[in-house]
C-alpha cells in the first residue's frame, strides 16, 4: 500500500491498517435533550484515553454559546448595594442572572429587558426575549419583590466561548450603572469518559470509549461531540505534510498519461479480499473494481453486514492501485467492453 507522490513514497499502511470504529452509538435508555452517553468502539489500544481526553477538553472549553455580558438595573449605580422592596441584594440578583441559560440564532449582540411591578417572585420568564433569543430555563429564580415596587433592567446577550471575566469583554461602555458580568458561554455543563476493553474477533486488546455529555439545552449532546471532533480535526490536519487524497487526475480513473487505469476492469475475486468483504460486494451486485470505486464510503457502509473493518480493508487495496472510493468513471460499461475486445484480439 505504497503511494508515490512526486519523489516521495507514502506508506498508507500507517493509517489504513489501524482498527477504526464502525459508528458512534448513543445509549437511548438515558438519552435526553441535555444528556447523552456515547459508545465508540473498537479503537486501538491507548486511543480511548487519547481521544477521550482531547474531546473532553474541547467540549468544555471551545464550543460557542450565548450568555449575558452586562446588566443595567434602573436606579442602581453599582452591584454592592440594595434596592428597596427587593429581598435579595444586588450581588445575589446578579449571581442569579448569570445562571440564565440562553439560545441565540445570531452573532449580533442582543438587548433584552425585564420589568416587574408586582409583589412576589421574579423569574427568568419575566425577561422579555426577542426573535433571536430564547430563555431555556424560565423557572429560574432571579429576585423576590416584598412590596409593589418596580424592578427594571436591561441586559445584553452575546455569543462567545469558554469563560470570559467581566473586565475582558470588548466594546462595553464604562458608564455609571452598567454592571459587567463574568460570562460562561459554554453550552456543555459536564463531560465524563471511561475506557474499557473491546473485542475484535478473538482479540481483546482494543479500547472501548464511553463518552458522557451534559449540555444546557442550547445544543444537543450529539451536535456537541460533532462540533468538538471537527475542531480537533481542523487543528491537527496542519501536521499532515503530504496529499492524503488520490490526485485529481486519478479521480476519474485515468493515470498521469490519460490512459484508463486497467485495474478498473479487474474482478473483485482477484483482489484477494477477506471472504466477508468479498461476499458483501457480491451481495451488493459489485463484480468489478470499476463498479466498486464509483460507490462512496457512505454508500458502502449502508450495505448489509458491511462494516468499517471491511471498508478499510478494501480502501487499502484500492489505494495500492491508485484508486479510491467516490471516483467518477465516465461510460465505464463502454470502456469495459472495449477493454474486453482488446484483450480478446491480443489473445
From Swiss-Prot:
One of its GO terms (biological process) is DNA-templated transcription. Gene3D superfamilies: 5' to 3' exonuclease, C-terminal subdomain, DNA-directed RNA polymerase, insert domain, RNA polymerase, RBP11-like subunit. One of its GO terms (cellular component) is DNA-directed RNA polymerase complex. Residues 1-243 are annotated as: Alpha N-terminal domain (alpha-NTD). Pfam families: RNA_pol_A_bac, RNA_pol_A_CTD, RNA_pol_L. It is an enzyme of class 2 (transferase). CDD domains: RNAP_alpha_NTD. Keywords: DNA-directed RNA polymerase, Nucleotidyltransferase, Transcription, Transferase. It catalyses: RNA(n) + a ribonucleoside 5'-triphosphate = RNA(n+1) + diphosphate. The keyword Transmembrane helix does not apply. Residues 260-347 are annotated as: Alpha C-terminal domain (alpha-CTD). Its EC number is 2.7.7.6. Homodimer. The RNAP catalytic core consists of 2 alpha, 1 beta, 1 beta' and 1 omega subunit. When a sigma factor is associated with the core the holoenzyme is formed, which can initiate transcription. Belongs to the RNA polymerase alpha chain family. DNA-dependent RNA polymerase catalyzes the transcription of DNA into RNA using the four ribonucleoside triphosphates as substrates. This is DNA-directed RNA polymerase subunit alpha. It comes from Desulfovibrio desulfuricans (strain ATCC 27774 / DSM 6949 / MB). The gene is rpoA.
Amino acid at each position: 500500500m505504497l503511494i508515490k507522490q512526486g519523489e516521495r513514497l507514502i506508506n498508507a499502511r500507517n493509517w489504513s491498517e489501524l482498527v477504526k470504529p464502525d459508528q458512534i452509538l448513543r445509549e437511548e435508555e438515558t438519552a435526553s435533550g441535555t444528556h447523552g452517553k456515547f459508545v465508540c468502539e473498537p479503537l486501538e489500544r491507548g486511543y480511548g484515553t487519547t481521544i477521550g481526553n482531547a474531546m473532553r477538553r474541547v467540549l468544555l472549553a471551545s464550543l460557542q454559546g450565548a450568555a449575558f455580558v452586562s446588566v443595567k438595573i434602573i436606579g442602581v449605580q453599582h452591584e454592592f448595594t440594595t434596592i428597596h422592596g427587593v429581598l435579595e441584594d444586588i450581588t445575589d440578583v446578579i449571581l442569579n442572572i448569570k445562571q440564565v441559560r440562553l439560545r441565540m440564532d445570531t452573532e449580533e449582540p442582543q438587548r433584552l429587558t425585564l420589568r416587574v411591578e408586582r409583589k412576589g417572585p421574579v423569574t427568568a420568564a419575566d425577561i422579555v426575549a426577542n426573535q433571536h433569543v430564547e430563555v431555556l430555563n424560565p423557572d429560574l429564580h432571579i429576585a423576590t419583590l416584598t412590596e409593589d415596587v418596580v424592578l427594571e433592567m436591561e441586559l445584553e446577550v452575546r455569543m462567545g466561548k469558554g469563560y470570559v471575566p467581566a473586565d475582558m469583554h470588548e466594546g462595553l461602555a464604562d458608564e455609571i450603572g452598567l454592571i459587567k458580568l463574568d460570562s460562561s458561554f459554554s453550552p456543555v455543563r459536564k463531560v465524563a469518559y471511561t475506557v474499557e476493553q473491546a473485542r475484535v474477533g478473538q482479540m481483546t486488546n482494543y479500547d472501548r470509549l464511553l463518552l458522557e455529555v451534559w449540555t444546557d439545552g442550547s445544543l444537543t449532546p450529539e451536535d456537541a461531540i460533532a462540533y468538538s471532533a471537527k475542531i480537533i480535526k481542523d487543528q491537527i490536519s496542519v501536521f499532515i505534510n503530504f496529499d492524503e487524497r488520490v490526485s485529481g487526475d486519478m479521480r476519474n480513473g485515468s493515470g498521469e498519461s490519460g490512459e484508463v487505469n486497467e485495474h478498473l476492469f479487474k474482478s473483485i475475486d482477484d483482489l484477494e479480499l477477506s471472504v466477508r468483504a468479498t461476499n458483501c460486494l457480491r451481495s451488493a451486485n459489485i463484480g468489478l473494481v470499476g463498479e466498486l470505486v464509483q460507490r462512496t464510503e457512505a454508500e458502502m457502509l449502508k450495505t448489509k453486514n458491511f462494516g468499517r473493518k471491511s471498508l478499510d480493508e478494501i480502501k487499502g487495496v484500492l489505494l495500492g492501485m491508485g484508486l479510491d472510493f467516490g471516483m467518477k468513471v465516465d461510460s465505464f460499461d463502454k470502456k469495459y467492453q472495449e477493454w474486453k475486445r482488446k484483450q480478446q484480439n491480443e489473445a
